[in-house]
Amino acid sequence: MPTATNDGVAIHYEVDGPTDGEPVVLIEGLGYGRWMWRWQRERLADEYRLLLPDNRGTGDSDVPEGPYTMAAMAGDVDAVLADAGVEAAHLVGASMGGMIAQQYALDYDRAATLTLLCTSHGGEESVPIPEETAATILEVPEGYDERETIRHRMEPAVSDGFYDANPDLVESIVDWRLAGDATEAGRNAQAAAVQAFDVGDRVSKIDQPTLVLHGSADRVVPVENGRLLAEKLPDGDLEIVEDGPHLFFIEDPDHVADRIREHLFANPIEAATDAGAGGGD
Protein backbone atom coordinates (compact mmCIF):
# COMPACT_ATOMS: atom_id res chain seq x y z
CA MET A 1 0.00 0.00 0.00
CA PRO A 2 1.40 3.45 -0.90
CA THR A 3 2.40 5.76 1.93
CA ALA A 4 2.63 9.55 1.99
CA THR A 5 4.26 11.54 4.78
CA ASN A 6 3.07 14.84 6.23
CA ASP A 7 5.22 16.43 8.91
CA GLY A 8 6.52 13.03 9.95
CA VAL A 9 3.09 11.35 9.99
CA ALA A 10 2.71 8.38 7.64
CA ILE A 11 -0.59 8.35 5.76
CA HIS A 12 -1.45 5.10 4.01
CA TYR A 13 -3.78 5.09 1.04
CA GLU A 14 -5.17 2.74 -1.57
CA VAL A 15 -5.51 3.39 -5.29
CA ASP A 16 -8.18 1.79 -7.47
CA GLY A 17 -9.49 2.25 -10.98
CA PRO A 18 -7.86 3.07 -14.32
CA THR A 19 -4.58 4.97 -14.20
CA ASP A 20 -5.85 7.40 -16.83
CA GLY A 21 -9.13 8.12 -15.02
CA GLU A 22 -9.80 11.49 -13.42
CA PRO A 23 -8.56 11.29 -9.80
CA VAL A 24 -11.19 11.16 -7.06
CA VAL A 25 -10.24 11.26 -3.37
CA LEU A 26 -12.70 9.56 -1.00
CA ILE A 27 -12.19 11.05 2.47
CA GLU A 28 -13.28 9.12 5.55
CA GLY A 29 -15.55 10.29 8.35
CA LEU A 30 -14.82 10.46 12.07
CA GLY A 31 -13.28 7.20 13.20
CA TYR A 32 -14.34 5.27 10.10
CA GLY A 33 -11.97 3.26 7.94
CA ARG A 34 -11.86 2.76 4.17
CA TRP A 35 -14.69 0.24 4.42
CA MET A 36 -17.20 3.13 4.47
CA TRP A 37 -16.48 3.83 0.79
CA ARG A 38 -16.68 0.24 -0.46
CA TRP A 39 -20.10 0.82 -2.10
CA GLN A 40 -19.01 3.94 -3.97
CA ARG A 41 -15.70 2.30 -4.78
CA GLU A 42 -17.51 -0.57 -6.48
CA ARG A 43 -19.57 1.86 -8.54
CA LEU A 44 -16.92 4.42 -9.50
CA ALA A 45 -13.71 2.41 -9.98
CA ASP A 46 -14.61 1.47 -13.55
CA GLU A 47 -14.11 5.06 -14.71
CA TYR A 48 -12.23 7.05 -12.07
CA ARG A 49 -8.82 6.74 -10.45
CA LEU A 50 -9.81 6.47 -6.81
CA LEU A 51 -7.51 7.42 -3.94
CA LEU A 52 -8.64 6.25 -0.50
CA PRO A 53 -6.46 7.55 2.33
CA ASP A 54 -6.76 6.48 5.94
CA ASN A 55 -7.02 9.63 8.04
CA ARG A 56 -4.34 10.05 10.70
CA GLY A 57 -5.40 7.91 13.64
CA THR A 58 -7.25 5.45 11.41
CA GLY A 59 -6.49 2.05 9.92
CA ASP A 60 -2.98 1.70 8.53
CA SER A 61 -1.99 5.35 9.03
CA ASP A 62 0.05 6.60 11.97
CA VAL A 63 -1.66 7.58 15.21
CA PRO A 64 0.19 10.68 16.39
CA GLU A 65 -0.64 12.25 19.71
CA GLY A 66 -3.77 14.43 19.59
CA PRO A 67 -5.63 16.62 19.42
CA TYR A 68 -5.67 16.81 15.64
CA THR A 69 -6.70 19.79 13.55
CA MET A 70 -8.64 19.92 10.31
CA ALA A 71 -5.72 21.84 8.80
CA ALA A 72 -3.35 18.97 9.58
CA MET A 73 -5.71 16.42 8.06
CA ALA A 74 -6.14 18.58 4.95
CA GLY A 75 -2.35 18.59 4.78
CA ASP A 76 -2.45 14.80 4.90
CA VAL A 77 -4.71 14.79 1.83
CA ASP A 78 -2.32 17.08 -0.01
CA ALA A 79 0.59 14.81 0.90
CA VAL A 80 -1.31 11.87 -0.60
CA LEU A 81 -2.02 13.76 -3.82
CA ALA A 82 1.61 14.83 -4.08
CA ASP A 83 2.82 11.29 -3.45
CA ALA A 84 0.44 9.96 -6.11
CA GLY A 85 1.57 12.58 -8.61
CA VAL A 86 -1.88 14.16 -8.84
CA GLU A 87 -2.10 17.84 -9.77
CA ALA A 88 -5.90 18.13 -9.63
CA ALA A 89 -8.59 15.89 -8.15
CA HIS A 90 -12.25 15.67 -7.28
CA LEU A 91 -12.71 15.52 -3.50
CA VAL A 92 -15.57 13.51 -1.98
CA GLY A 93 -15.94 13.69 1.78
CA ALA A 94 -18.59 12.45 4.21
CA SER A 95 -19.21 13.89 7.68
CA MET A 96 -15.74 14.77 9.05
CA GLY A 97 -14.41 13.94 5.59
CA GLY A 98 -16.55 16.75 4.21
CA MET A 99 -14.97 19.11 6.71
CA ILE A 100 -11.51 18.01 5.63
CA ALA A 101 -12.53 18.63 2.01
CA GLN A 102 -13.70 22.16 2.82
CA GLN A 103 -10.49 22.90 4.68
CA TYR A 104 -8.49 21.49 1.80
CA ALA A 105 -10.25 23.69 -0.75
CA LEU A 106 -9.46 26.75 1.35
CA ASP A 107 -5.81 25.88 1.99
CA TYR A 108 -4.63 24.14 -1.20
CA ASP A 109 -5.10 24.37 -4.94
CA ARG A 110 -5.50 20.79 -6.20
CA ALA A 111 -9.29 20.47 -5.62
CA ALA A 112 -11.23 20.66 -8.90
CA THR A 113 -14.65 19.89 -7.41
CA LEU A 114 -16.11 18.97 -4.04
CA THR A 115 -18.86 16.54 -3.13
CA LEU A 116 -19.86 17.04 0.51
CA LEU A 117 -22.06 14.45 2.20
CA CYS A 118 -23.79 14.75 5.58
CA THR A 119 -21.45 17.49 6.78
CA SER A 120 -21.27 21.03 8.14
CA HIS A 121 -19.15 24.17 7.96
CA GLY A 122 -18.97 24.09 11.77
CA GLY A 123 -19.04 26.97 14.19
CA GLU A 124 -21.81 28.60 16.20
CA GLU A 125 -24.19 28.79 13.24
CA SER A 126 -24.14 25.04 12.74
CA VAL A 127 -26.80 22.80 14.27
CA PRO A 128 -25.20 20.46 16.84
CA ILE A 129 -25.64 16.75 17.21
CA PRO A 130 -28.99 16.06 18.92
CA GLU A 131 -28.74 15.27 22.62
CA GLU A 132 -30.42 11.89 22.17
CA THR A 133 -27.87 10.87 19.55
CA ALA A 134 -24.96 12.05 21.69
CA ALA A 135 -26.31 10.06 24.62
CA THR A 136 -26.57 6.90 22.51
CA ILE A 137 -22.99 7.27 21.34
CA LEU A 138 -21.57 8.07 24.77
CA GLU A 139 -23.73 5.91 27.06
CA VAL A 140 -23.12 2.29 26.18
CA PRO A 141 -25.14 -0.19 28.25
CA GLU A 142 -23.12 -2.00 30.89
CA GLY A 143 -21.91 -5.41 29.85
CA TYR A 144 -21.83 -4.77 26.10
CA ASP A 145 -18.92 -6.41 24.32
CA GLU A 146 -16.96 -4.74 21.53
CA ARG A 147 -19.31 -5.84 18.75
CA GLU A 148 -22.43 -4.83 20.65
CA THR A 149 -20.86 -1.45 21.43
CA ILE A 150 -20.20 -0.78 17.73
CA ARG A 151 -23.77 -1.70 16.79
CA HIS A 152 -25.19 0.44 19.60
CA ARG A 153 -23.17 3.53 18.74
CA MET A 154 -23.83 3.25 15.00
CA GLU A 155 -27.60 2.88 15.31
CA PRO A 156 -28.42 6.63 15.10
CA ALA A 157 -26.47 6.83 11.83
CA VAL A 158 -28.73 4.38 9.98
CA SER A 159 -32.44 4.20 9.23
CA ASP A 160 -34.92 2.65 11.62
CA GLY A 161 -35.22 -0.98 10.63
CA PHE A 162 -31.86 -1.13 8.84
CA TYR A 163 -30.41 -3.53 11.38
CA ASP A 164 -33.39 -5.90 11.22
CA ALA A 165 -33.51 -5.81 7.42
CA ASN A 166 -29.77 -6.35 6.92
CA PRO A 167 -28.43 -8.57 9.72
CA ASP A 168 -25.63 -10.14 7.66
CA LEU A 169 -24.49 -6.77 6.29
CA VAL A 170 -24.49 -5.27 9.78
CA GLU A 171 -22.27 -8.08 11.04
CA SER A 172 -19.91 -7.52 8.09
CA ILE A 173 -19.77 -3.80 8.88
CA VAL A 174 -18.88 -4.63 12.47
CA ASP A 175 -16.09 -6.89 11.18
CA TRP A 176 -14.78 -4.15 8.90
CA ARG A 177 -14.92 -1.60 11.68
CA LEU A 178 -13.01 -3.82 14.07
CA ALA A 179 -10.35 -4.36 11.41
CA GLY A 180 -9.95 -0.86 9.98
CA ASP A 181 -11.47 1.90 12.11
CA ALA A 182 -9.56 4.44 14.17
CA THR A 183 -8.06 3.52 17.49
CA GLU A 184 -9.77 5.04 20.53
CA ALA A 185 -6.96 7.57 20.83
CA GLY A 186 -7.16 8.38 17.13
CA ARG A 187 -10.92 8.80 17.25
CA ASN A 188 -10.73 11.14 20.23
CA ALA A 189 -8.04 13.20 18.50
CA GLN A 190 -10.20 13.43 15.37
CA ALA A 191 -13.23 14.40 17.44
CA ALA A 192 -11.27 17.34 18.83
CA ALA A 193 -10.68 18.54 15.25
CA VAL A 194 -14.39 18.30 14.50
CA GLN A 195 -15.26 20.18 17.67
CA ALA A 196 -12.89 23.03 16.79
CA PHE A 197 -13.79 23.20 13.09
CA ASP A 198 -15.34 26.48 11.92
CA VAL A 199 -15.09 27.84 8.39
CA GLY A 200 -18.51 29.47 8.40
CA ASP A 201 -17.00 32.87 7.64
CA ARG A 202 -14.70 31.49 4.92
CA VAL A 203 -16.78 28.90 3.12
CA SER A 204 -17.98 31.54 0.64
CA LYS A 205 -14.40 31.58 -0.68
CA ILE A 206 -14.73 27.99 -1.90
CA ASP A 207 -15.40 28.58 -5.59
CA GLN A 208 -15.13 25.02 -6.86
CA PRO A 209 -18.34 23.42 -8.16
CA THR A 210 -19.71 21.71 -5.06
CA LEU A 211 -22.44 19.11 -4.69
CA VAL A 212 -23.97 18.98 -1.20
CA LEU A 213 -25.90 15.80 -0.39
CA HIS A 214 -27.68 15.46 2.94
CA GLY A 215 -30.28 13.06 4.30
CA SER A 216 -33.48 14.64 5.57
CA ALA A 217 -33.54 12.20 8.50
CA ASP A 218 -29.90 12.61 9.57
CA ARG A 219 -29.77 12.13 13.35
CA VAL A 220 -26.04 12.82 13.63
CA VAL A 221 -25.48 15.97 11.55
CA PRO A 222 -28.97 17.50 11.19
CA VAL A 223 -30.06 18.38 7.67
CA GLU A 224 -30.14 22.10 8.46
CA ASN A 225 -26.35 21.97 8.27
CA GLY A 226 -26.45 20.91 4.64
CA ARG A 227 -28.80 23.77 3.81
CA LEU A 228 -26.62 26.32 5.62
CA LEU A 229 -23.53 25.05 3.85
CA ALA A 230 -25.06 25.10 0.38
CA GLU A 231 -26.44 28.61 0.90
CA LYS A 232 -22.94 29.98 1.53
CA LEU A 233 -21.19 28.21 -1.33
CA PRO A 234 -20.89 30.38 -4.47
CA ASP A 235 -21.25 27.34 -6.73
CA GLY A 236 -23.12 24.95 -4.48
CA ASP A 237 -25.81 22.49 -5.57
CA LEU A 238 -27.92 21.04 -2.75
CA GLU A 239 -29.86 17.80 -2.84
CA ILE A 240 -31.81 16.61 0.18
CA VAL A 241 -32.12 12.83 0.19
CA GLU A 242 -35.65 12.19 1.40
CA ASP A 243 -35.71 10.08 4.59
CA GLY A 244 -31.96 9.59 4.25
CA PRO A 245 -30.04 8.86 7.47
CA HIS A 246 -26.48 9.94 8.19
CA LEU A 247 -25.10 6.95 6.28
CA PHE A 248 -27.47 7.36 3.33
CA PHE A 249 -24.57 6.71 0.95
CA ILE A 250 -24.41 3.17 2.33
CA GLU A 251 -28.16 2.58 2.30
CA ASP A 252 -28.75 4.03 -1.18
CA PRO A 253 -25.39 3.66 -2.93
CA ASP A 254 -26.74 3.58 -6.48
CA HIS A 255 -28.40 6.98 -6.23
CA VAL A 256 -25.37 8.54 -4.54
CA ALA A 257 -22.96 7.12 -7.12
CA ASP A 258 -25.20 8.38 -9.92
CA ARG A 259 -25.24 11.89 -8.44
CA ILE A 260 -21.47 11.89 -7.97
CA ARG A 261 -20.97 10.76 -11.57
CA GLU A 262 -23.31 13.47 -12.86
CA HIS A 263 -21.46 16.11 -10.85
CA LEU A 264 -18.02 15.00 -12.01
CA PHE A 265 -19.13 14.61 -15.62
CA ALA A 266 -20.55 18.15 -15.61
CA ASN A 267 -17.33 19.52 -14.11
CA PRO A 268 -14.36 17.74 -15.68
CA ILE A 269 -10.95 18.43 -14.21
CA GLU A 270 -9.51 19.96 -17.38
CA ALA A 271 -12.28 22.57 -17.45
CA ALA A 272 -11.93 23.26 -13.74
CA THR A 273 -8.19 23.78 -13.90
CA ASP A 274 -8.50 25.95 -17.01
CA ALA A 275 -10.93 28.13 -15.04
CA GLY A 276 -8.42 28.41 -12.19
CA ALA A 277 -10.53 26.67 -9.54
CA GLY A 278 -8.81 26.40 -6.20
CA GLY A 279 -8.32 28.00 -2.84
CA GLY A 280 -4.98 28.26 -1.16
CA ASP A 281 -5.58 31.78 0.02
Give names to the regions the model predicted.
Residues R219-N225:
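Conserved alpha/beta-hydrolase "acid-adjacent" motif
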Residues G236-D281:
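Catalytic active-site module of serine/aspartate enzymes centered on a nucleophile-bearing elbow/loop
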Residues G93, G97, A101:
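Gly/Ala-rich beta-loop-alpha elbow adjacent to hydrolase catalytic centers
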Residues T5-G66, M70:
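Conserved HGGG/HGGXW glycine-rich cap/lid loop of the alpha/beta-hydrolase fold
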Residues I206, V212-H214, D218:
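Short beta-strand/loop motif that positions the catalytic acidic residue
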Residues L106, T113-Y144, G186:
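Flexible "cap/lid" loop of the alpha/beta hydrolase fold
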